[in-house]
Amino acid sequence: MHNNLVILAGGASSRMKKEAVLDNLSAEEIAQANERSKGLIGVGASGRPLLDYLLLNAKKAGYKNIYIIIGEQGELFKEFYGSQNLNNDFHGLNISFAVQYIPDGRVKPFGTADALFQAVEQFPELNTQQYSVCNSDNLYSAKALLALRETTSPNAFIAYDRDALEFPSERISRFAIAKLDQNNQLLDILEKPSADVLADYKDVEGKIRVSMNAFKFNGSTLYTHLKNCPVHPERDEKELPTVLLNSVKEHPNTTLGIPFSEHVPDLTAKEDIADVKAYLKEHYPVLDWQA
């Protein structure tokens, strides 16, 4: 089992910065949503950020080395998790920071695949090891994170049952869906699925599976695909699902979809803040690092 978890936190958070359609937020919450990276918004006990809870679950799952990919203006992460670039001790986790630099000529970061490529360039030891990757603005369970550590598949991702996600149906319908074979090996990822093709994408349990960006990768075989990832024609970004599919084309039967049926709290927009706060209050009344 590997001990490395890379957390994607360098994005532009553009949807979070849009004006809220609800009026259930305080002035402080609105200010944080507009100014902070999503994972640093204070939705938890005593105003602690969502990322605390993700790190807690990572620790419970047995991860030791955490690499947080931050943007060029990501100094606030260091106020929360350690002032050094390398080897900060946060409740027994070893936290280091990679920086996703924005290329000349661009205003926004170049996508999740670019973020991970910059991270493995800055921490080349990852290219000879296995590691997990996830978002900073989702709260994955310790059980799901442990499944990524435990799998013997070279590459893997958590394949969530779409029906178990507690989001509005309109939002869920926009999620990309994964096509798996009878052994749960990844065959394809379909973006913006239309209702008429959904039946073709059901797995052996009859479930529609979606990815929430919780991955496990073999560093040595993934590197080439990260380096050569093409730009998505519509979104003008380099994205991890593209890397995954290119890897599958070259190495079939090496990317396992691990079936899970549970909700994954998500901080995408201001409308999510109250829901995530309520979820944490119910499921994590205390941030207990000793448990």
Question: Which residues are covered by each model-predicted region?
Answer:
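Conserved beta-loop-beta/alpha segment of the NTase-like Rossmann-fold superfamily
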Residues: G92-I177
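Phosphate- and divalent-cation-binding pockets in alpha/beta enzyme and binding domains
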Residues: L76-E79, K143, V243, D275
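A structural signal for short hydrophobic beta-strand segments in well-ordered beta-sheet cores
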Residues: L40, I177-L180, G257
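Cofactor-binding loop segments of dinucleotide-utilizing enzymes, especially the Rossmann-like FAD-
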Residues: L8-G11, G71, S136, Y160, ...
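Conserved core of the sugar-phosphate nucleotidyltransferase
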Residues: S141-T224
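Conserved alpha/beta core of the MobA/IspD/sugar-nucleotide pyrophosphorylase nucleotidyltransferase superfamily
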Residues: I189-A291
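Conserved N-terminal catalytic core of the sugar/cofactor nucleotidyltransferase
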Residues: M1-I7, S13-A31, G44-Q130
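Hydrophobic packing residues within well-ordered alpha-helices of enzyme cores
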Residues: M16, F77-Y81, L148, L226, ...
